Amino acid sequence: MSKRKEFDEDAPVDPSDLLEFINLGAGNEVGRSCHVIQYKGKTVMLDAGVHPAYTGLSALPFFDEFDLSTVDVLLISHFHLDHVASLPYVMQKTNFRGRVFMTHPTKAVCKWLLSDYVKVSNVGMEDQLYDEKDLLAAFDRIEAVDYHSTIEVEGIKFTPYHAGHVLGACMYFVEMAGVNILFTGDYSREEDRHLHVAEVPPKRPDVLITESTYGTASHQPRLEKEARLLNIIHSTIRNGGRVLMPVFALGRAQELLLILDEYWNNHLDLRSVPIYYASSLARKCMAIFQTYVNMMNDNIRKIFAERNPFIFRFVKSLRNLEKFDDIGPSVILASPGMLQNGVSRTLLERWAPDPRNTLLLTGYSVEGTMAKQITNEPIEIVSLSGQKIPRRMAVEELSFAAHVDYLQNSEFIDLVNADHIILVHGEQTNMGRLKSALASKFHNRKVDVKVYTPRNCVPLYLPFKGERLVRALGKVAVHKPKEGDIMSGILIQKDANYKLMSAEDLRDFSDLTTTVLTQKQVIPFFSSMELANFHLKQMFGYVKQSKTKAGQPQYTVMDAITLTLIQEHKLALEWVGNIMNDTIADSVITILLGIESSPASVKLTSHKCNHLHSHLDKPPKVSKEEDRIKKLMMFLDNQFGESMTKTEKGVEIKFEKYEASIDFSTMKVECSNEALRSRVVHVLSRAINTILPFSEASQNDVSEDDFENEESDDDKIFEQQTKIEDDVKNENKTEPVEEQKSEEKNEQPNLKKEELS
């Protein structure tokens, strides 16, 4: 029989068994997404975007750090610029010779989107990454694929699945030489008005490459989010203001337009307020959305059966900003979403000084962009011409970015169940928080799940053995395993052959024999064995006691680790070497080496010093009673503050017209008002209850003989506390003040140690 061989971390790794992953972009950042996977001589590139905060060559991924001629397949997840805008540069300006794939909607939108990117790029000809000619040449080589269809290229298989981010967005399930990899791209697990949620592939991947855009943040539920969005817009309009919503030309803008169009339809008072979509590109691409309705969810299909939902009833296209009649309230969705330039930046500079207006940020804001800067609500902003403009308009953030939050990401990671998780597409802080959260979550799992956050241009190596045939022999092969059964034994490799057998069969089926390794370690030890026994019991619960042939005490921890005092100040530990015993031994050694510095050890072994030290300065003598009174005063002062006054016998507490007095010699409370008296009695008893255990414990001797005492210190302290609290309450039972005064002269303080014991 045979079984797939799993990777052994302790085994030597052949370089050919290492999967290499490298970020050329989007490593500890958001922008210029580009990732490369190499394994068994095959290379896959995932996405090729630009960084929205930079221009020209500086916006590109670090293509110079990798030989692009080795790339077999380039897979594009969706049409956003930070994932696709450098694709024509790769295909036309480098030595890339591989094949490029994306879904049909992505290819249709990309043609218009990248053409617009070339036109509006705010750079000179010398810094332009590519021109229209390069774009057309590149698109002739791009191949479109359908969801759920498996394509094989040069031994590499990949299947696209719905990602739920924008129309056409997909995640890729890639198979390379027996290793399964899932790349999510940007994805969403929250169903909206027109897109499918991200799918969970039917096969389990070995490696998951997932976004970390929002780290450990949590999104509002969709309905609450929509309600807040509409409330902000409606409130701004009622105040006579304008609403600016910077958006990407395509993607989430269509979702927002669907929400606004429906809201305007249900509110007659808003129909006179115009909604504008300021993007000529979006107008051109709207036909694509109308074409690919069959790739959207059931909600939009039902509406489409009656009318085309993307032919909006209350949304107008703003063709020319110069002809825009900017009078009265309005709502404008304008690109670009990062406010770096274009219509959205022009309107921001125009509307920023008016406090009635609102800037509504609905997407993720990348570091280094105006969208990110204005979230800090600065007093002024700098215009594209360099002028300072006062910022009085309100700034609101509400994420409709269709990225997963922590709960959605964590749930998806659990469903996918990969052993290796690589986080990309996230700022360093968010990515670090997500890694820590996942590491804590996976801490107690039986299978070790590893989480990685590689930086740009820093390769990550993951060891994977390819598929191997393993022969099960001897006792291991007696019972035929069923699907899902786990087989255990010793795996023997000789040349390219693998055999699985039990330890008893090694002599029969191999040239190997077995032996037991006994570990022994000697450590310095300056405490007593009784003290060691005490601390080990605290940790492990049960410690077996015995003696050596020489009569030396010997302890056995967890039936695995044996401790013997071999000579003065030297303690020997012995155990049979294995993972569990080694771990227990490490814990035992740590405890033993820390005994001398343990506060418990100091308390248990401390004794009174009964002789004089004439060479030392004598501290001022403070009686035990004075020390108690001092601590008691501190406690009462914290409770009653300025209401308390010190007297000869104790203290006096005044509250409005009532007075209560405490006599420290008897601990009696006198007061004509029962409510105040009860309060003071309660506080006094709590004070004594708090102070006594520590002051008494610090004065008492504790010998090593106490270790075996069945009555714990906690029990003694509890008895003392109970007795004192009862004494105070009994002494302070309600009695006539005259009778109490007559008895005070003969009473002794009831806090003396002799009475307690």
From Swiss-Prot:
The residues annotated as the active site are 403
Superkingdom is: Eukaryota
The UniProt keywords, alphabetically, are: Cytoplasm, Endonuclease, Hydrolase, Metal-binding, mRNA processing, Nuclease, Nucleus, Zinc
Ranges for the region named Disordered are 698-757
Acidic residues bias spans: 702-714
Entry GO terms, CC: cytosol; mRNA cleavage and polyadenylation specificity factor complex; nucleus
Does this entry carry the keyword Metal-binding? yes
Which stretches are tagged as biased composition: Basic and acidic residues?
715-757
- Annotated compartments: Cytoplasm; Nucleus
Q: Which residues bind Zn(2+) 1?
A: 78, 80, 165, 186
- UniProt entry tagged with the keyword Cell membrane: no
The residues the record assigns to binding Zn(2+) 2 are 82-83, 186, 425
Any idea what job this protein has?
Component of the cleavage factor I (CF I) involved in pre-mRNA 3'-end processing.
- UniProt name for this protein: Endoribonuclease ysh1
